[in-house]
């Protein structure tokens, strides 16, 4: 049975059981505590934990999931994978254990010919929680023999969130693969033979004081009990397809086979090759799905995970002997099978493939240069008797050659050496400072999100947003937080977070910055609002300072948004929609939005594109945007169900979380239509003007447009006009002649600088006879040092070689000349053959000097070069070379 068929049967079965079929959410989780959607229940957490009312009583889905915790084990075992799909059925206060057990048994054991999954009932086992007699009896009633029902403890069969909230026992269903796979005795005896295929979680208790997974207090029964189940689609697929693991199912095997074909290796012949092919098969599919959900390669967050997946796959192919680009062969193979369930992969494949291929090309260049450096470092480490690469080596690989530390660790393990990871981390910390905190955590001041979830649970209803209709309104203070702790009141001068029962303030989201304004109580206390966040869905947190009076929880207030700021941000947001549409018209439908920021008077629009955009195209985009502004198109918003919105042509942004009801913002009826929760102008003409100030690449497959909007754009153009007028007066040219005139001036300036450098170099080289005439004797070695002052590195090398030749080969000689090139100190050292015979090497001397200069360097025994940061240390560096020569000759170093 094909994987897509299992998926279809699952959804059809539960739809017949009156479940709402919910499309898969994005792999990029909307939960700020998660990077990815790691389980089928993640999109339903707000409903399962009663943060917000569920829009349906019953739901079913096949959810895309990604886990990378055990990425290093992928391919080495047949259990580990990164991307997987989780079938789930959910009940929100509707049916409970009896129906959940009955549904599971019916779907599993109904013959394939009758629409079921056709598992042999005699090969099914279940586990229940130790004290869950009810679940035990329900399994007996559907026909499961008592001897195939095993009771297990909290560690295996009790679910909780890790914090106070809902929890309850669970029941797991296993399939017996037979004696060839292990010992008899059920799941407790051997989980290689008895494979878990379905987990039923019975959320029936309110837990308190959760200390660990197995140590918690049960406060009582939940008023409304929920069901959350999960079935691994790939796991069921390999059982139904008669193969041994997920790598061999129909949705994964084609990539594995293509890797074997490209490499000329046979899967199943050599264990190391099998591991690499499985890595390729898994990671290519994961990369396909991540890029499909809008992720682009980057150096942090989800982008870094994607980059790592692509690079691990590319490197695995190189280890299989494939030197040419492999993704153009592998990615289409994955798309062909995955598009049966996710048809958008086919329609979006031009964009997806462009992003993936660009990342492979970039990494292949990195591998070519970096691998040689890595192998040299390993050889030198082993030759010196070491067992671990230094932190400095690992850092150099990362900083200079683009090797991520995980790749260095992986390659080092394969080469049989360790890595000084703490040393690497320390150097990284020095370079980049403290790592950026998660954006949500920064916005909430580092306060634990559990505090906000608890605050929301205490409210009688989620906060109502009224800001679409009005920029002011009456409300009441529900909660006052100070330092993450609820307080009954807050005096003047206090920084607080305030929750109102309703608010006109827009919380930062969807690329739009938060509203500012004031909240005034009937007694005259005033909160100056400087930020508004929605840390958990349904909770608006107003951050600010009490400027007068005392805020008291429960007080009636008048909330007023800064209307000027709101209008300016709204103009920027509408401008972003205009730019998005025009970019797609000029660059194609694959140039979709990847991010944005809408601030007062300015906008930033990130979009997906692998090609550089010509300047005249950017100017055309700006011109068309302003044409649409002056067309005075109507801007309207309507709320509708998600499916209708998408069918109407509205664009949904990858990675965004949408509910069943969505807000659609349209410009000019059907000209631009996007799912959007932000605020906008009433017409395009109210935007005023858009002036694009930059268009640039921000990474592989992504570009950015930055623009000024409205009055800020007018001010910018006014300043530009004044600047042009000033330039025309200075260079005595008309505006249209400025580029040629300034270009000619720059050419003349460059020629003059070259001539000055030539003359200065001649002066430096003319010093060679004088410098060579003043050697210092260091225990029989002639040492010449000289500080040349401002000079080019090329002239330094020429001078050093000239002086060395003048000293001859009869006696051991060392020449060291330093200078300052482009504001940085440079040192060049040369030795003759006799000096090298005495053990004096140029590379060793340069490293000594460079350390004094605060830098590094190296080279050959006869000629080496280094540099640093501090020009004032040049005399000390040269003296250090003299001293080191003496120490080397006398044997003290």
From Swiss-Prot:
Region described as Disordered: 853-872
Required co-factors: Zn(2+)
Residues given in the record as Zn(2+) binding sites: 573, 577, 676, 680
Compartments reported by the entry: Cytoplasm
Protein origin, superkingdom: Bacteria
Enzyme class name: ligase
Domain comment (free text): Consists of three domains; the N-terminal catalytic domain, the editing domain and the C-terminal C-Ala domain. The editing domain removes incorrectly charged amino acids, while the C-Ala domain, along with tRNA(Ala), serves as a bridge to cooperatively bring together the editing and aminoacylation centers thus stimulating deacylation of misacylated tRNAs.
Protein name: Alanine--tRNA ligase
